[in-house]
Every structure is written in structure tokens, then in C-alpha cells.
A protein has these predicted regions:
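Short loop segments and helix-boundary regions at transmembrane helix junctions
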Residues: 29-33, 62, 72-118, 163-165, ...
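Transmembrane helix-bundle core of multi-pass membrane transporters
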Residues: 84-85, 92-163, 190, 255, ...
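Inter-helical junctions in multi-pass inner-membrane proteins, predominant
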Residues: 1-9, 161-167, 194-231, 255-265
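Short, non-helical or kinked segments that cap or interrupt transmembrane helices
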Residues: 25-44, 59, 90-95, 169, ...
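Membrane-embedded helix boundary and interhelical linker motif in transport proteins
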Residues: 29-80
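Membrane-interfacial amphipathic/re-entrant helices at transmembrane-helix boundaries
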Residues: 1-19, 47, 60-62, 89-97, ...
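Cytosolic-side transmembrane-helix boundaries in multi-pass membrane proteins
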Residues: 119, 175-182, 186-189, 259-293
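Helix-loop-helix "hairpin" substructures at the membrane interface of multi-pass membrane proteins
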Residues: 136-215, 239-245
């Protein structure tokens, strides 16, 4: 097994894990998977590519603008496609699935018509590069190291956030929504905040992924599927689960691609997902709770 393939799998797994974290951020206070997260990842990458390549803007300023724009788009999605459904007094069922998928199709179709299907090459931020250096028998680039570092920073930031008052309120809603509301916690306000933060983070994931996977309309569906797989493998709502699930997925994908034809990579990852869910339906780090009524 080539060590370089393992490194590439780990780095791809970090991108999948970060995508899964954006799904979990919104899921915890709302019990809703925003399937438009993949489109937000793609839009972040496309805005960034347009600003850097077309507008000749600096990498860091373009990243800031792209993240802000995607956060605002995520706010609009919350106001139009999620909040009106989950606030229904009769219950929302799974209506959010249809609404967020509809938003996904609208956004992807709009971006595809505006910029076309051709992928755009995005440079990594200076002084990072995609040039490989031989380290312990593996080819590693400075940008790959940067992605791993960003994932570690995201874990630390989320751990810190959930230890604060607002984060603790989100965890309380995730644990027992009714009891949290009796304590004066507003699920709607926290859902709005989580949607903005999750959307902005999705835009940043798109920026991180673009130098490796190129900025294109197809980037969104690919990372949405992989991010959802990471969450399902690791356990819904679990930060640790999304991270470990994403890394397992990326490494397994790389190993499968090196041993078999690359065309079987998706089949290999879905087989892994199916196997884990057959053994542990709640995921590796998910929990099952029985509620007395």
C-alpha cells in the first residue's frame, strides 16, 4: 500500500469530516439535515474562484467575502425553506427534506447556468502550495498539512463553543427540546444562529476543497454525499463521530481506489456505510435514547 494514497485519503477524509460537521451544526438544535449544505459548499468554492481568478483579489479577502455571502444565503434558506416548516403547529414530519432538496436543485441549476459546468482551478493560499515533498516515504504537500490543521482547529473551536452558554443551550435542545423550552431557551433563535454558522462553515469548506477538487457545480453533490456518510458512520450529532467517520471514509476510499478501479470507490464507501449501520444502526459514536411519555 502506497503511503501517499493513505495521506491523500486522510486529507480527503478531513474535507468529508468538515462537511459532516456543517450538517451536525444545524441538526443539533433543529433535528433537520439541511441537504442544501452541499450546494452551499459549491457556492463558496465558486464565489471564491471567481474573486481570485477573475477579480484578481487576494486569497484571504476573497475567502472572507465568500464565507460571508454563503452565510447570508444560508440565512435565506433558513427563513424560506426550513423555519416555516419546522414551526408548523401540526408537526413538520419530513417536509424539510423536500424543501432543502428543492433549494439544492434551484441553486445548482442557477450556478450551472451562470458559470457553466467547467471546473475552475483555484490556487492554495500563499505561502502554501500543492508541490509535494517526500516525508517518511509519502508525498505530502504543505496545503494538505494545512487542511489537516484546519480540521483540528475546527474541532477545538466547536469544543469551545459548546462549552459556552449558547453552545450549552444548543446541547440542551438536542437532549430534550421540551425541557429546554420550559427553561426559557428559544429553539428558533438558536436554529437561526446554527444555520448561519453552519452555512458560513460550508462556504469555508468549499474554499478549502477547491484547490484539491476544483471549483465546479459537481463539487456540492459529491461532498454532500460524503459528508452525510461521515455523519452516518460516526453517529448523528456527534462531533467526534463526524471527524472519525470522515477520516475512516477517506482512507477506506483511498485504499479501495488503489486496490481496485477508481470507478468502484463510491461502491466501496457505500458498502462500508452499510456494514457499519448493520452492526451499529446509530453509528460508531451515536447513542440511542428511550424516552418515557
Amino acid at each position: 500500500m502506497d503511503p501517499s494514497s493513505l495521506v491523500q485519503g486522510l486529507v480527503a477524509g478531513c474535507i468529508y469530516a468538515l462537511t459532516g460537521l456543517t450538517l451536525n451544526i444545524i441538526y443539533r438544535p433543529t433535528n433537520v439535515f439541511n441537504f442544501a449544505q452541499g450546494a452551499l459548499v459549491m457556492i463558496g468554492a465558486m464565489i471564491f474562484a471567481w474573486l481570485v481568478a477573475g477579480g484578481r483579489m487576494s486569497w484571504y479577502l476573497a475567502a472572507l467575502i465568500a464565507v460571508g455571502c454563503v452565510g447570508l444565503i444560508s440565512l435565506a434558506i433558513w427563513l424560506v425553506a426550513i423555519s416555516p416548516i419546522i414551526r408548523r403547529p401540526t408537526g413538520h414530519g419530513a417536509g424539510w427534506i423536500i424543501s432543502t432538496l428543492a433549494v439544492t436543485m434551484i441553486l445548482e441549476d442557477a450556478v450551472g447556468k451562470l458559470v457553466g459546468p467547467d471546473p475552475r482551478i483555484v490556487p492554495p493560499p500563499p505561502p502554501m502550495s500543492m508541490n509535494f515533498h517526500r516525508i517518511l516515504g509519502a508525498d505530502v504537500s504543505s496545503y494538505q498539512v494545512t487542511i489537516v490543521v484546519f480540521m483540528l482547529l475546527a474541532i477545538i473551536a466547536m469544543g469551545w463553543f459548546y462549552a459556552q452558554r449558547t453552545g450549552a443551550a444548543i446541547l440542551a435542545i438536542a437532549e430534550d427540546r421540551d425541557a429546554a423550552m420550559l427553561r426559557g431557551i428559544d429553539p428558533g433563535r438558536l436554529g437561526l444562529l446554527s444555520c448561519i454558522v453552519g452555512g458560513a462553515m460550508a462556504g469555508f469548506v468549499g474554499i478549502l476543497a477547491a484547490p484539491m477538487m476544483y471549483a465546479s457545480v459537481s463539487l456540492g453533490p459529491t461532498l454532500l454525499i460524503r459528508g452525510f456518510e461521515a455523519v452516518a458512520i460516526g453517529g448523528t450529532g456527534s462531533v467526534r463521530g463526524a471527524v472519525i467517520g470522515g477520516c475512516i471514509l477517506g482512507i477506506f476510499e483511498a485504499v479501495g481506489g488503489s486496490l481496485m478501479s477508481p470507478g468502484y470507490q463510491s461502491a466501496v464507501t457505500f458498502a462500508l456505510l452499510l456494514l457499519i449501520l448493520l452492526v451499529r444502526p446509530q453509528g460508531l459514536f451515536g447513542t440511542t435514547r428511550a424516552r418515557v411519555i
